[in-house]
Regions:
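Conserved alpha/beta catalytic core and glycan-binding cleft of carbohydrate-active enzymes
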Residues: 116-119, 331-479
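Active-site-proximal helices and loops of the catalytic beta/alpha 8
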Residues: 40-42, 50, 66, 192-196, ...
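Short, solvent-exposed loop/turn segments at secondary-structure junctions
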Residues: 28-33, 142-144, 209-213, 285-288, ...
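Low-complexity, glycine/alanine/valine/leucine- and proline-rich hydrophobic stretches
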Residues: 474-508
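Hydrophobic faces of well-ordered beta-strands that scaffold small-molecule active sites
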Residues: 21-25, 202-206, 279, 327-329, ...
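A structural motif corresponding to the C-terminal end of an alpha-helix
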Residues: 13-19, 187-202, 271-278, 315-326, ...
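Acidic/aromatic-lined carbohydrate-recognition and catalytic surfaces
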Residues: 1-222
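Substrate-binding/active-site clefts of carbohydrate-active enzymes
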Residues: 132, 201-264, 268-271, 275, ...
Length: 536
């Protein structure tokens, strides 16, 4: 399991060896304080605070102050979980976090210098009452059990005497949860600082999830902010997810947002830009409208509810301009044309993915792919997304095999196999036409997978898009899906270790393929002349 120290090293390595200008990461919003952890970074407990499971204990200043017994215990805890880092099977995130949390509690007990304590106090003051609210939920989770296993979530709230008593009786635990947030903030800030000092134009690109867990800290402490209990958020059916998706998240209450001047949204965006040079908005359509799904209806039974996109885009552009940053809106799938027009008018980038980019936006699998030279300029262009298998896997129909295995297909497997075959052939035709592969390679895909993956990345370089992205999974030749939309426990979503085609875990950059590095380098060369202008 990686940590913020690994992130820092990845950023500086990408900057120094590939001249990369940014690195897009999954959301690092807050998760549960103890196991069981929610594997999906897109279903956080709070979007205001950070995921502390990625803290690197050794990088905390007070780590050096551990006494001999405490240091020995920390090293023992680390030794117990270290072998898992060489295993390409499913990551045991619960065990990894349990061991790390014990180590962090020991570091927390080390006395801080006056300067460090002052910095901690300043952090708490700047974070405001929401920090103690999140800490209270975290302590309640530990003392009263997971909220889905008991009644405390429904029977208590921020004004309950039981909650006040809990915070008094367990003030040390509340302080520990606040401290974890401070340490996470420090380490992500250090990663972003290192990225910029290494020459990255943007550094970290953080990802903003659509919403939060229905039983998480944000909903418990401030239920009035959400449409709680009767609806969840998702998306309607499309070609890639025939059943639609229900993300299980309560939507923001648009009336509350308007009445309170979008304060909660402002705080969230401001916090993300304090550690990043760019922010990607997952499902940017959510700024305009969200697919509300009535309880028990399934994704097909939903309907769109509109939001004041002008207010939220204004907040995004103002906060981005404070750090000379960028905003990327994930506008894939079912998105009205006016959404892309509005984004471009304000200098917000959209997303273009080679696997989705067809001539005239045709939905038919066998229709020709667009020439990347015709892609939008104001966009982040990539070969694939985290909702598809890595490109090597996609070329070998891993998406069809996995969906059949998980009973996610809505018709005969032969029908979907034929569609995937037509889709692949259309991509091969585009690559042959672009003179990036030969007809002989196109006729013998299985023996030339990596050559085709390289060709697809080289084709991306012909795009005029201001940001170009290569996925790390493609860089090392991984084939397994990191995430299968529409599933939860059925698949090991977000727990698949990074491995090469031989399923050996990747620890160094030695396996990163030249085309992935070239995408980063070519993007660096063009960035100064193509920087979009953010318009608040």
């Amino acid at each position: 399991v990686g940590d913020y120290g690994d992130l820092k090293l990845l950023l500086t390595d990408a900057a120094e060896k590939s001249h990369a200008d940014f690195m897009l990461i999954n959301p690092i919003h807050a998760t549960a304080p103890v196991e069981p952890l929610e594997p999906s970074p897109y279903l956080p407990e709070s979007r205001r605070f950070m995921n502390v499971t990625y803290i690197r204990p050794q990088d905390i200043e007070e780590y050096a102050g551990l006494d001999e017994a405490a240091l020995a215990e920390v090293e023992r805890l680390h030794a117990e979980v270290a072998p898992a880092n060489d295993n390409a099977d499913e990551l045991d995130i619960n065990s990894a976090w349990w061991h790390k949390r014990q180590a962090l509690q020991l570091v927390f007990k080390v006395p801080r210098s006056a300067e460090r304590q002052a910095a901690f106090e300043a952090f708490k003051e700047a974070a405001g009452p929401d920090l103690r609210a999140f800490a209270a939920w975290s302590v309640a989770f530990q003392m009263w059990g997971a909220p889905w296993e008991g009644t405390w979530f429904a029977e208590t709230n921020r004004d309950s005497p039981e909650v006040a008593e809990l915070m008094r009786d367990h003030a040390d635990m509340v302080e520990f949860e606040c401290w974890l947030q401070w340490i996470a903030d420090e380490q992500v800030t250090a990663a972003q600082t290192a990225a910029r000092e290494s020459g990255m134009a943007l550094g970290l690109m953080q990802d903003m999830a659509v919403g939060v867990h229905s039983l998480g800290a944000d909903v418990w402490w401030n239920p009035e902010r959400f449409a709680v209990g009767s609806v969840t958020v998702g998306c309607p059916p499309d070609f890639y997810n025939q059943q639609g998706q229900d993300w299980g998240q309560p939507p923001f209450n648009p009336n509350y947002l308007a009445k309170t001047g979008y304060g909660v949204y402002r705080e969230m965006v401001h916090n993300m830009f304090s550690h990043a040079g760019a922010v990607r908005i997952d499902h940017v359509l959510g700024l305009f409208r969200l697919w509300w799904i009535p309880q028990g209806e399934g994704a097909r039974g939903g309907a769109y509810v509109t939001y004041d996109y002008e207010a939220m885009i204004a907040i995004l552009t103002i906060e981005a301009s404070r750090v000379n940053g960028l905003v990327v809106g994930e506008d894939l799938g079912t998105v009205p044309d006016y959404v892309r027009t509005v984004l471009a008018e304000h200098g917000l980038l959209g997303c273009t993915v080679e696997w989705f980019a067809r001539v005239d936006d045709s939905p038919n699998a066998g229709d020709p792919y667009a020439d990347p030279a015709d892609y939008r300029e104001y966009a982040l262009a990539s070969v694939t997304t985290h909702d598809l298998p890595p490109t090597a896997g996609y070329l070998q129909f891993e998406h069809v095999k996995l969906r059949e295995e998980l009973n996610l297909l809505t018709g005969p497997v032969e029908e979907f196999q034929a569609s995937a075959t037509a889709e692949r052939q259309a991509m091969l035709d585009r690559l042959v036409e672009s003179e990036l592969i030969t007809p002989e390679i196109a006729a013998d895909v299985d023996d030339h997978i990596q050559e085709i993956v390289e060709a697809m990345h080289k084709m991306l370089l012909r795009s005029p898009s201001v940001l170009l992205q290569a996925a790390l999974v493609d860089g090392v030749g991984e084939t397994r899906s990191q995430n299968q939309p529409g599933t939860s426990s059925e698949y090991s979503n977000w727990r698949v270790p990074l491995a090469g085609p031989d399923l050996k875990v990747v620890h160094t950059d030695a396996s990163v393929r030249p085309a992935a590095r070239e995408v980063a380098f070519r993007h660096h060369e063009r960035r100064k002349s193509k920087r979009p202008h953010i318009t608040p």
